[in-house]
Amino acid sequence: MTMPQTFLLSLFLFLLSLPMQAQREGFSVSPVPDAVFQRMKGKSYKSGCTVPRSELRYVRVLHHTLEGKVKHGEIVCHRRIANDLLEIFQELFRARYPIAQIRLIDDFDADDTRSMEANNTSCFNFRRVKGSRSLSKHALGLAIDINPLFNPHVSQGGARVNPAAGRAYADRRKNFPHKLTASDFCVKLFKAHGFRWGGNWRHSKDYQHFEK
């Protein structure tokens, strides 16, 4: 191979790698930075939180919105699932999988209902299961909700829908965009990483929910 050919091949391979380099640059895992922890204190990281800050990780991702725009997203989760989430969201981004928004629930004052109504994908929030004294998997940073408005928690035979604003999406026999089903790419991806999907629960269906 001549010198010009070698140069052109090297240039081609370099240019080919740029999208992947840019993509990797949009994704990261780190300990929770001080500025982020200040946003969390008194909100998702409430007084009496039993999860040490050192056990949590701050995950930065890129995602495609419902309108097809590329946006930055941020997630706080337990360190045990941080790399899983990083890989999952990299795959979702490569597949141009639409996610409305990915913001810390602290932007909604850690109000789960407000976050769900805004169709916000989120993970850590130190709270109890509604109507129970048990800690939610979200309290441990081991659960994440994806596009929750379109994929509500349905219980009591459909009489109860959470968020209530998602009632139009409670009947899963209907066809509509962004519906999480067993055959959906996102669901398969989470399952491949060892997560359990709330859409498979027996006594209620939490279609937005993945936990480990």
Range-by-range predicted roles:
Residues 1-8:
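Bacterial N-terminal signal peptides that target proteins for export
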Residues 22, 51-56, 117-119, 137-139, ...:
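A generic structural signal for short, non-catalytic loop/turn and secondary-structure boundary residues
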Residues 129-131, 135, 140-212:
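Catalytic cores and adjacent binding grooves of peptidoglycan-active enzymes
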